[in-house]
């Protein structure tokens, strides 16, 4: 009578892992190769998270609103900073659909917040990179912590 084999209920952590009928194993002879490629793949995920976060909105305390931080929005903010004066009564649409009067002080606060949040997320990505490089199992590395908050629509 043949023994019934247990099938895995998940994908292997890396393409180098093999199923022994009860758990995923990583043969010693491919451990460093698997570790290298898993770390490289995870680092790409971290960079993508940083990229997405930078475009996920920025919260400006003085008006209590989220502003867009897409590449297009950043370009508009940069252009407006080159103007000697903003158009009077310039109404700007925020991420929740409300409009606010965009003044020079508000544009300054918004610009500073964009730079500050970007630098914090950059530092966080670098922190995760260092920890990832130290990990013996980079395929299991959790990089979800330490990121700046991004806009989430209320449902």
What positions do the PLM features span?
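A preference for well-ordered globular domain cores
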Residues: 1-155
